[in-house]
């Protein structure tokens, strides 16, 4: 006779699923991340171009 198969608990064997966690952190959309990155790149380019003239 075959032995009964042991089953795992329905909670995913104790593994934490991060998308279930509710945090109070600042949430930013992917578009926001891209926009912020583009702004920082533009600022970096402007500072390299005009920084020596402005800051001596």
Swiss-Prot record:
Pfam families xref list: Sec61_beta
Protein family per UniProt: Belongs to the SEC61-beta family.
Species annotation: Thermococcus onnurineus (strain NA1)
Oligomeric form and interacting partners: Component of the protein translocase complex. Heterotrimer consisting of alpha (SecY), beta (SecG) and gamma (SecE) subunits. Can form oligomers of the heterotrimer.
Task performed by this protein: Involved in protein export. The function of the beta subunit is unknown, but it may be involved in stabilization of the trimeric complex.
Main location: membrane
Residue ranges crossing the lipid bilayer per the database entry: 30-51
Entry superkingdom: Archaea
Protein name: Preprotein translocase subunit SecG
Membrane-protein topology: Single-pass membrane protein
Location in or out of the cell: Cell membrane
């Amino acid at each position: 006779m075959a032995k009964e198969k042991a089953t795992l608990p329905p909670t995913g064997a104790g593994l934490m699923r991060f998308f279930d966690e509710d945090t109070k952190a600042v949430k930013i959309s992917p578009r926001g991340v891209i926009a912020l990155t583009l702004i920082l790149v533009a600022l970096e380019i402007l500072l390299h171009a005009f920084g020596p003239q402005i800051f001596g």
